[in-house]
From Swiss-Prot:
GO terms for biological process: maturation of SSU-rRNA from tricistronic rRNA transcript (SSU-rRNA, 5.8S rRNA, LSU-rRNA); regulation of translation; ribosomal small subunit biogenesis. Belongs to the SAS10 family. Disulfide bonds: none annotated. It is found in: Nucleus; Nucleus, Nucleolus; Chromosome, Centromere; Cytoplasm. Residues 125-170, 280-317 are annotated as: Disordered. Keywords: Cell projection, Centromere, Chromosome, Cytoplasm, Nucleus, Repressor, Translation regulation. Part of the small subunit (SSU) processome, composed of more than 70 proteins and the RNA chaperone small nucleolar RNA (snoRNA) U3. Residues 146-157 have a biased composition (Acidic residues). Part of the small subunit (SSU) processome, first precursor of the small eukaryotic ribosomal subunit. During the assembly of the SSU processome in the nucleolus, many ribosome biogenesis factors, an RNA chaperone and ribosomal proteins associate with the nascent pre-rRNA and work in concert to generate RNA folding, modifications, rearrangements and cleavage as well as targeted degradation of pre-ribosomal RNA by the RNA exosome. Its dissociation from the complex determines the transition from state pre-A1 to state pre-A1*. May inhibit mRNA translation. It comes from the Eukaryota. Residues 297-317 have a biased composition (Basic residues). This is Neuroguidin-A. GO terms for cellular component: axon; chromosome, centromeric region; cytoplasm; dendrite; filopodium; nucleolus; small-subunit processome.
Length: 317
């Protein structure tokens, strides 16, 4: 019993200080609440358009403090709080407040912005909602009269009366491009043709077969289809997929039709078995630069002569 009495005596000074601090805080809170109540009743603070979420939160906190104060009063008077209904109400209110905390965190930005707008009467300078498109910026700020108005102004100046321009919209004048002569020397042209011939030679069938012959990489087994046919089939499949997906028919140009006809005819021609001129650009073979690149034959177009049917003419005697 003596040990319990010593513990109680040690806690008495701390308890007295807590009660004094609590009394001071209660006095300040009471004065603040009375001041707010008076301002709300007088119409200084308009609460008609308030947030229902904050109102609910304030009501729950008020009920929580009431029940907590009632339990403290019961314990101060030395009564038992076992089976007191206030405990169940505290647990329920505490659970609801804990469930409202994530919602409060999500609405914190909107609530702070609305409270600031209600206090200051306007949004902040750095508010993202202020940075919106301004249609006035689309108007032209150039003050230059049109040609008609300038002409009328000159006529008025000659007569002694000058008219002010009514419109300040500048007319768009496209830039004038002066033709420039294309300087291309014969050496540059030959060099460009040789480079093109080298690219064609590197992608030729002869170089590809030599690479496959002396390479250590595993050989790819193909089902007897030529490279140009595989490339043609791939392009044709891509074309078909595009037409089916876009629901449109693609027209073939004359160049594409000629290339398709040439590719299909290469499978039945045996004249190019001993033709090695496609790698002459790599071996340094002699010849003109024009001969290194296969040229496309252009069909000559000319006016068609109308053929008249020959018939027997009657001779008049």
């Amino acid at each position: 019993m003596a040990a319990a009495g010593d513990v109680i005596l040690e806690d008495v000074p701390g308890s007295v200080n807590l009660f004094n601090t609590l009394q001071d805080q209660i006095t300040k809170v009471t004065a603040h609440v009375q001041d707010l109540t008076q301002k709300v009743r007088s119409g200084i603070y308009n609460t008609d358009k308030g947030l229902s979420f904050l109102e609910l939160k304030d009501q729950l906190l008020l009920f929580y403090l009431q029940d907590l104060t009632h339990l403290m009063l019961e314990k101060t008077n030395g009564k038992s709080i076992k089976g007191n209904p206030g405990i169940l109400r505290l647990v329920e209110l505490r659970t609801v407040l804990e469930k409202m905390r994530p919602i409060d965190q999500k609405l914190k930005y909107q609530i702070d912005k609305l409270v600031k707008a209600a206090v200051t009467g306007s949004l902040g300078e750095n508010d993202p909602l202020r940075f919106k498109p301004n249609p006035q910026n689309l108007m032209s700020k150039l003050s230059e009269p049109d040609e008609r108005e300038s002409d009328s102004g000159e006529e008025g100046a000659e007569g002694g009366v000058a008219k002010k321009p009514q419109s300040k919209v500048k007319r768009y004048i496209p830039p004038r491009l002066a033709p420039v002569h294309y300087d291309d020397t014969e050496a540059e042209r030959e060099h460009r043709i040789v480079e093109r011939a080298k690219k064609l030679a590197l992608s030729s069938s002869t170089i590809r077969e030599l690479k496959e012959q002396y390479s250590d990489a595993p050989e790819e087994i193909r089902e007897g289809r030529a490279y140009h046919m595989m490339r043609h089939d791939k392009e044709e499949q891509h074309r078909i997929n595009h037409e089916e997906s876009m629901m449109v028919r693609l027209n073939m140009t004359r160049k594409e039709k000629a290339r398709k006809k040439r590719v299909l005819s290469m499978t039945s021609q045996l004249n190019s078995l001993t033709h090695f001129s496609d790698i002459s650009a790599l071996t340094g073979g002699e010849g003109r630069a024009e001969d290194m690149v296969p040229s496309m034959k252009k069909s000559k177009k000319g006016p068609k002569k109308s053929k008249k049917k020959k018939g027997f003419s009657r001779r008049r005697h």
